[in-house]
Protein backbone atom coordinates (compact mmCIF):
# COMPACT_ATOMS: atom_id res chain seq x y z
CA UNK A 1 0.00 0.00 0.00
CA UNK A 2 3.03 2.31 -0.07
CA UNK A 3 2.25 3.78 -3.49
CA UNK A 4 -1.49 4.42 -3.22
CA UNK A 5 -0.99 8.20 -3.27
CA UNK A 6 1.96 8.28 -5.65
CA UNK A 7 1.91 11.58 -7.53
CA UNK A 8 -0.04 13.42 -4.81
CA UNK A 9 1.70 16.48 -3.37
CA UNK A 10 1.00 17.73 0.14
CA UNK A 11 2.14 20.99 1.72
CA UNK A 12 2.10 20.76 5.49
CA UNK A 13 2.17 23.80 7.78
CA UNK A 14 1.82 22.15 11.17
CA UNK A 15 3.66 21.39 14.39
CA UNK A 16 3.73 18.93 17.28
CA UNK A 17 2.19 15.52 16.51
CA UNK A 18 -1.55 15.52 15.75
CA UNK A 19 -1.67 17.02 12.25
CA UNK A 20 1.94 16.11 11.34
CA UNK A 21 1.10 12.45 12.00
CA UNK A 22 -1.59 12.73 9.31
CA UNK A 23 1.11 13.96 6.95
CA UNK A 24 3.31 11.01 7.92
CA UNK A 25 0.50 8.59 7.07
CA UNK A 26 -0.02 10.27 3.70
CA UNK A 27 3.72 9.90 3.09
CA UNK A 28 3.48 6.23 4.05
CA UNK A 29 0.82 5.87 1.35
CA UNK A 30 3.13 7.38 -1.25
CA UNK A 31 2.37 11.11 -1.19
CA UNK A 32 5.15 13.67 -1.54
CA UNK A 33 4.82 15.66 1.68
CA UNK A 34 6.70 18.93 2.10
CA UNK A 35 6.77 20.14 5.69
CA UNK A 36 7.09 23.92 5.90
CA UNK A 37 8.74 25.14 9.11
CA UNK A 38 9.65 28.59 10.31
CA UNK A 39 13.19 29.91 10.15
CA UNK A 40 13.60 30.34 13.92
CA UNK A 41 13.92 26.76 15.08
CA UNK A 42 11.24 24.90 13.18
CA UNK A 43 8.69 22.54 14.67
CA UNK A 44 8.88 22.74 18.50
CA UNK A 45 8.41 18.97 18.59
CA UNK A 46 12.07 18.79 17.56
CA UNK A 47 12.95 19.82 21.11
CA UNK A 48 10.37 17.76 22.98
CA UNK A 49 11.80 15.53 25.70
CA UNK A 50 9.28 12.78 26.50
CA UNK A 51 9.61 11.17 29.91
CA UNK A 52 13.04 12.71 30.39
CA UNK A 53 14.42 10.67 27.48
CA UNK A 54 16.77 12.94 25.55
CA UNK A 55 17.29 12.31 21.82
CA UNK A 56 21.07 12.45 22.21
CA UNK A 57 20.91 9.52 24.64
CA UNK A 58 19.05 7.26 22.21
CA UNK A 59 20.76 4.55 20.18
CA UNK A 60 20.07 6.48 16.96
CA UNK A 61 20.54 10.04 18.27
CA UNK A 62 17.05 11.07 17.16
CA UNK A 63 13.78 12.31 18.66
CA UNK A 64 11.40 9.34 18.62
CA UNK A 65 8.17 11.38 18.76
CA UNK A 66 9.36 13.79 16.07
CA UNK A 67 10.22 10.85 13.82
CA UNK A 68 6.84 9.18 14.35
CA UNK A 69 4.97 12.26 13.22
CA UNK A 70 7.31 13.36 10.45
CA UNK A 71 9.00 10.41 8.80
CA UNK A 72 8.94 10.21 5.03
CA UNK A 73 8.68 13.97 4.48
CA UNK A 74 10.83 16.67 2.99
CA UNK A 75 11.34 19.81 5.09
CA UNK A 76 11.73 23.43 4.04
CA UNK A 77 12.25 26.47 6.27
CA UNK A 78 10.36 29.54 5.04
CA UNK A 79 9.46 32.86 6.60
CA UNK A 80 5.98 33.02 5.11
CA UNK A 81 5.47 36.50 6.60
CA UNK A 82 8.10 37.98 4.29
CA UNK A 83 7.29 38.86 0.65
CA UNK A 84 9.91 36.42 -0.61
CA UNK A 85 8.72 33.66 1.68
CA UNK A 86 5.10 34.16 0.73
CA UNK A 87 6.01 33.98 -2.95
CA UNK A 88 7.79 30.66 -2.39
CA UNK A 89 4.92 29.35 -0.28
CA UNK A 90 2.42 30.40 -2.93
CA UNK A 91 4.34 28.45 -5.57
CA UNK A 92 4.28 25.37 -3.34
CA UNK A 93 0.52 25.69 -2.84
CA UNK A 94 0.05 26.21 -6.57
CA UNK A 95 1.64 22.83 -7.26
CA UNK A 96 0.02 20.91 -4.38
CA UNK A 97 -3.03 18.69 -4.11
CA UNK A 98 -3.45 19.12 -0.35
CA UNK A 99 -2.73 21.82 2.22
CA UNK A 100 -2.47 20.35 5.72
CA UNK A 101 -2.34 22.61 8.78
CA UNK A 102 -2.98 22.92 12.50
CA UNK A 103 -2.96 26.70 12.51
CA UNK A 104 -6.02 28.11 14.22
CA UNK A 105 -8.57 30.24 12.34
CA UNK A 106 -7.25 33.53 13.73
CA UNK A 107 -3.67 32.58 12.85
CA UNK A 108 -4.64 31.74 9.28
CA UNK A 109 -6.56 35.01 9.05
CA UNK A 110 -3.57 37.07 10.22
CA UNK A 111 -1.26 35.28 7.82
CA UNK A 112 -3.73 35.75 4.92
CA UNK A 113 -3.99 31.99 4.51
CA UNK A 114 -7.76 31.73 4.63
CA UNK A 115 -9.61 29.39 2.30
CA UNK A 116 -10.23 32.21 -0.18
CA UNK A 117 -6.59 33.30 -0.08
CA UNK A 118 -5.30 29.76 -0.61
CA UNK A 119 -7.71 29.19 -3.47
CA UNK A 120 -6.19 32.21 -5.25
CA UNK A 121 -2.98 30.19 -5.48
CA UNK A 122 -4.75 26.96 -6.39
CA UNK A 123 -8.52 26.63 -6.77
CA UNK A 124 -8.34 22.82 -6.78
CA UNK A 125 -6.39 22.36 -3.56
CA UNK A 126 -7.89 20.30 -0.74
CA UNK A 127 -7.60 22.10 2.59
CA UNK A 128 -7.29 19.89 5.68
CA UNK A 129 -7.33 21.49 9.13
CA UNK A 130 -6.82 19.86 12.50
CA UNK A 131 -7.40 21.72 15.76
CA UNK A 132 -8.13 21.25 19.42
CA UNK A 133 -11.81 22.17 19.51
CA UNK A 134 -12.85 22.54 15.86
CA UNK A 135 -13.38 25.49 13.54
CA UNK A 136 -16.59 26.86 15.08
CA UNK A 137 -17.75 27.98 18.49
CA UNK A 138 -16.27 30.08 21.31
CA UNK A 139 -13.18 27.87 21.69
CA UNK A 140 -12.22 27.60 18.01
CA UNK A 141 -9.16 29.79 18.53
CA UNK A 142 -8.06 28.19 21.77
CA UNK A 143 -5.11 25.83 21.36
CA UNK A 144 -5.42 22.23 22.42
CA UNK A 145 -3.32 19.15 23.09
CA UNK A 146 -4.43 15.55 23.24
CA UNK A 147 -4.05 15.48 27.02
CA UNK A 148 -6.59 18.29 27.36
CA UNK A 149 -8.89 18.33 24.32
CA UNK A 150 -8.93 14.57 23.69
CA UNK A 151 -8.30 12.87 27.03
CA UNK A 152 -9.76 15.44 29.39
CA UNK A 153 -12.48 17.45 27.71
CA UNK A 154 -13.89 14.69 25.50
CA UNK A 155 -14.27 12.36 28.47
CA UNK A 156 -11.71 9.72 27.55
CA UNK A 157 -10.06 9.96 30.97
CA UNK A 158 -13.44 9.60 32.69
CA UNK A 159 -14.32 6.55 30.61
CA UNK A 160 -11.01 4.81 31.33
CA UNK A 161 -10.63 5.67 35.02
CA UNK A 162 -12.00 3.01 37.41
CA UNK A 163 -14.45 4.11 40.09
CA UNK A 164 -12.88 4.98 43.41
CA UNK A 165 -9.50 5.94 41.97
CA UNK A 166 -8.07 9.23 43.24
CA UNK A 167 -6.35 10.33 40.04
CA UNK A 168 -7.71 10.09 36.49
CA UNK A 169 -6.33 7.90 33.74
CA UNK A 170 -3.02 9.19 32.38
CA UNK A 171 -2.48 8.74 28.67
CA UNK A 172 0.79 7.79 27.06
CA UNK A 173 2.63 10.19 24.73
CA UNK A 174 0.64 11.32 21.66
CA UNK A 175 -2.17 8.86 22.47
CA UNK A 176 -4.96 11.02 21.04
CA UNK A 177 -2.73 12.75 18.50
CA UNK A 178 -2.07 9.58 16.54
CA UNK A 179 -5.71 8.51 16.54
CA UNK A 180 -6.71 11.97 15.34
CA UNK A 181 -3.99 11.98 12.71
CA UNK A 182 -5.22 8.66 11.33
CA UNK A 183 -8.75 10.04 11.02
CA UNK A 184 -7.54 13.25 9.37
CA UNK A 185 -5.42 11.30 6.87
CA UNK A 186 -8.45 9.17 6.04
CA UNK A 187 -10.47 12.33 5.49
CA UNK A 188 -7.85 13.63 3.08
CA UNK A 189 -7.92 10.35 1.15
CA UNK A 190 -11.72 10.57 0.92
CA UNK A 191 -11.45 14.19 -0.24
CA UNK A 192 -9.01 13.20 -2.98
CA UNK A 193 -11.48 10.56 -4.17
CA UNK A 194 -14.30 13.12 -4.06
CA UNK A 195 -12.29 15.62 -6.10
CA UNK A 196 -11.50 12.96 -8.68
CA UNK A 197 -15.15 11.99 -9.04
CA UNK A 198 -16.87 15.37 -8.74
CA UNK A 199 -14.20 17.93 -9.74
CA UNK A 200 -14.66 19.73 -6.44
CA UNK A 201 -11.97 20.19 -3.78
CA UNK A 202 -13.57 19.92 -0.32
CA UNK A 203 -12.39 21.19 3.04
CA UNK A 204 -11.54 18.54 5.63
CA UNK A 205 -11.83 19.50 9.30
CA UNK A 206 -10.88 17.41 12.30
CA UNK A 207 -10.30 18.09 15.98
CA UNK A 208 -8.92 16.32 19.01
CA UNK A 209 -12.19 16.98 20.81
CA UNK A 210 -14.24 15.31 18.07
CA UNK A 211 -11.80 12.39 17.92
CA UNK A 212 -12.11 11.89 21.66
CA UNK A 213 -15.91 12.02 21.53
CA UNK A 214 -15.88 9.36 18.81
CA UNK A 215 -13.54 7.21 20.92
CA UNK A 216 -16.03 7.20 23.80
CA UNK A 217 -19.15 7.13 21.60
CA UNK A 218 -20.43 3.92 23.29
CA UNK A 219 -20.30 5.63 26.69
CA UNK A 220 -22.08 8.70 25.32
CA UNK A 221 -24.78 6.63 23.63
CA UNK A 222 -25.34 4.38 26.65
CA UNK A 223 -25.51 7.40 28.97
CA UNK A 224 -28.17 8.88 26.68
CA UNK A 225 -30.12 5.64 26.30
CA UNK A 226 -30.08 4.60 29.96
CA UNK A 227 -29.63 7.84 31.89
CA UNK A 228 -26.43 6.67 33.57
CA UNK A 229 -22.72 7.57 33.35
CA UNK A 230 -21.98 5.31 30.39
CA UNK A 231 -20.69 1.76 30.12
CA UNK A 232 -20.56 0.20 33.63
CA UNK A 233 -17.03 0.05 35.02
CA UNK A 234 -16.79 -3.50 36.24
CA UNK A 235 -13.89 -4.52 38.42
CA UNK A 236 -11.69 -7.38 37.21
CA UNK A 237 -13.67 -10.62 37.38
CA UNK A 238 -17.03 -8.95 38.14
CA UNK A 239 -18.47 -8.39 34.65
CA UNK A 240 -21.71 -10.37 34.12
CA UNK A 241 -20.45 -11.62 30.75
CA UNK A 242 -17.41 -13.91 31.30
CA UNK A 243 -16.23 -13.27 27.74
CA UNK A 244 -15.37 -9.66 28.58
CA UNK A 245 -13.86 -10.33 32.00
CA UNK A 246 -10.13 -9.93 32.57
CA UNK A 247 -8.07 -12.91 33.62
CA UNK A 248 -4.51 -13.34 34.80
CA UNK A 249 -2.51 -15.59 32.50
For the regions a language model picked out, list residue spans one by one.
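Glycine-rich phosphate-binding loop and adjoining beta1-alpha1-beta2 segment
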Residues: 31-75
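Hydrophobic/aromatic beta-strand patches that form the interior of the parallel beta-sheet core
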Residues: 34-36, 76-78, 126-128, 204
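N-terminal Rossmann-like NAD(P) cofactor-binding subdomain of oxidoreductases
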Residues: 82, 101-160
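Acidic, glycine-rich segments within the central catalytic cores of soluble metabolic enzymes
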Residues: 41, 53-57, 136, 148-249
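Conserved small-residue-rich beta-alpha loop and adjacent elements
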Residues: 2-42
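Structural scaffold positions in well-ordered secondary structure
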Residues: 10, 26, 73, 100, ...
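A structured beta-alpha segment of the ubiquitous adenosine-cofactor-binding alpha/beta core
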Residues: 11, 57-120
Amino acid sequence: MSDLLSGIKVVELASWTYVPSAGAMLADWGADVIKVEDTKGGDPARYLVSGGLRPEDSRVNANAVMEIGNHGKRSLAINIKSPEGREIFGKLIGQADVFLTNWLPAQLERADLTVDALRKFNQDIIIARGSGQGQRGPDANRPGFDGTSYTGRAGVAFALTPDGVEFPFAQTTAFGDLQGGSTLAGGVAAALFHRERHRHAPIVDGSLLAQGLWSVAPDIAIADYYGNDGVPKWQAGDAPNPVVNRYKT
